[in-house]
Each structure stands twice: as C-alpha cells, then as structure tokens.
Design a protein with these regions (language model features):
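Long, basic/Gly/Ser/Thr-rich N-terminal segments
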Residues: 1-48
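Nucleotide-state-sensitive switch-loop elements of NTP-binding domains
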Residues: 39-50, 55-98, 102-193, 198-207, ...
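Generic beta-sheet signal
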Residues: 121, 207, 232-233, 271
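Alpha-helical scaffold elements adjacent to nucleotide-binding pockets in ATP/GTP-utilizing enzyme cores
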Residues: 134, 171, 196, 200, ...
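Short beta-strand/turn micro-motifs at beta-sheet edges
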Residues: 139-140, 216-221, 256-260
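Flexible active-site lid/hinge loop adjacent to a nucleotide/diphosphate
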Residues: 212-241
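Canonical P-loop GTPase G-domain recognition
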Residues: 229, 235-290
Length: 291
C-alpha cells in the first residue's frame, strides 16, 4: 500500500474535523443606515430656525478640508449672510491660565440673565506633532454648557496663527444667522502679536493677571494696544491689593497708546470669576462701547 505522503495532494498538514468557529459577525445584527446628507436649503432652513444640531453640522462642514464639503459650506454661508450682522461680537483673549474659560462661564450667564442668546466659539490650540486638540475649554464652562439659549462650539486652531481658527469668521456668520445676539470668540492663550481676532469682533477684551508685567508692557506694541478693555482677573482673597495695583499700572499703560478713532478710551477693571464680582462692570463697559 502506497504511503499517503507520496500522494501529490498531501499537504503535510492533517486537520481533524471539529467544531466550526462561529462567524465573527452577528447574523442578527441590523446595520444602521447612513445618515442622509442634508441639502443646502435644509441646512439654511434649520440654521435660521435656530436648530443647534444643524448649526453644529454646518460648522463642521465649514471646518472640513474636503473639497466637496467646502463647496457645500460656501453655498450655506452665502445664503446665511442676509441673516447675519445683528449681534455683538466680543473677542476674549489673554495669556494661558488667565481664566478665560472660567470668566466666560460667569460672564455668559450674566448675558443670559439679561435675556440674550449667546454663542461661544472657543479656539483650542492644536499639537504641532500629532495635529490633535483636546478641545477642553467647554469642560470649564460647567454652568454655561447646560444653560438654555447658550451654544458652545470648541474648535481646533489647526496651526493657524493669530489666536483663532481658520474658519472663525464663517462660524460667526452661521451663529448670527441662527439668532444668537451675542457671540464670544475665545482665543488660544496668546502672546503679544496674535491679534487676528481684533478684526473679527466689535469689542476686544483682554484678560490679564496681577504681576504679569508693569507699565513697560503697555509700551510694547502688540495685543495691548488692540484691547478695547482690560479685565484683571482673580481679584479675590489675598490677591485683591495686588489686583488694585495692577489696575492702576494697566490704566497708566493704556494712556501711552494713540487714542482710538472712535474716541473711546480703553479701561481697566478688576474682577473675579470665582467670587463673581466685577462681572456687571465689565458688561457695562462693553455696552457703553457698543452704543
């Protein structure tokens, strides 16, 4: 009898019949159909009606780098332009750790108490290595994030300079078309030269800390000369006296700049996001400037 190894069909491996392995895919699984892409008309209709879900989707399209998304978003923006331009745009900037996000949380609630609708566009820095972004600003706005008539949209800077994202202007237009009458643009923690947000907003608020510099900071041409107002944050506890000294120093530094074309004289105000003092005074300064 010829040995089976001499057969041409012999593979050198013998597999005994056993239990068949179950399929890795559940046969009873029902696949959810993909969402249909909304048309431009549906996007515009939803935005104008104040649908924040559709507004978020539209902002995502605007921020996308895909050519097909850019073409659709351009049409959406063009059709939303007639509904925009009716808000107070406030840019909020400052050094990292100055308390911008926490201040916006308290400041935003004050705006909502007056019956307004608030949109916050928070720009978060992107990693130069991984290109990713934590988008953690919203987590610091605990009360505002669950408040009615408030919309918070974190966006990555994606390497854009100037403290804002590449499509911040377009996002502002969409928020205005959705009926938000007050818009905060929170920049990344900026230095003295990143002032792109100034050209996008009506009022540019700079949040500073005590001990961050003396009058020499006022001489340095940069972000301070663009500010319409300075809020010296963390004026609480043992920091109150230092905050008052800083207020006087910044107020003196502001006089070193040429006067604004509008005749407005920038002011320095002390406030505390923790104790919630000085917030009405900051908003009063904004209203006086806008009027």
């Amino acid at each position: 009898m010829e040995h089976p190894e001499n057969s041409e069909e012999y593979k050198g491996l013998v597999v005994n019949k056993g239990i068949e392995q179950p399929s890795s895919v559940n046969p009873y699984l029902k696949r959810k159909p993909k969402k249909r892409q909304l048309s431009v008309a549906e996007f515009v209709e939803g935005i104008v009606k104040g649908d924040v879900t559709i507004l978020s989707q539209a902002v995502t399209l605007v921020e996308s780098v895909k050519p097909e998304h850019q073409a659709v978003s351009q049409e959406i923006i063009e059709k939303c332009l007639p509904f925009s331009g009716n808000s107070i745009r406030i840019g909020i900037s400052g050094v990292p750790g100055a308390g911008k996000s926490t201040s916006i949380d308290v400041f935003g609630l004050h705006v909502l108490e007056k019956g307004g609708k608030l949109a916050v566009l928070a720009i978060d820095p992107s990693s130069e290595r991984s290109k990713g972004s934590i988008l953690g600003d919203k987590t610091r706005m605990e009360d505002l994030s669950v408040a009615k008539n408030a919309f918070i949209r974190p966006s990555p800077s994606s390497g854009s300079l100037g403290g804002v994202a590449r499509k911040t202007r377009e996002s502002i237009v969409l928020c205005e078309a959705a009926g938000f009458d007050t818009i905060f643009v929170e920049t990344v923690g900026v230095g003295q030269s990143e002032t792109a947000v100034h050209s996008m907003v009506d009022f540019f608020l700079l949040i500073q800390l005590t001990g961050a510099g003396d009058e020499l900071q006022g001489i340095k041409r940069g972000i301070m000369e663009m500010a319409d107002g300075i809020a010296i944050n963390k004026c609480d506890g043992a920091n109150i006296d230092r905050a008052k000294v800083a207020k006087a120093q910044y107020q003196n530094a502001l006089h070193l700049f040429p006067p604004h074309e509008s005749g407005w004289s920038p002011e320095a105000i002390t406030c505390s996001s923790v104790e919630k003092n000085g917030i009405p005074e900051v908003w009063d300064m904004v209203e006086r400037y806008v009027q």
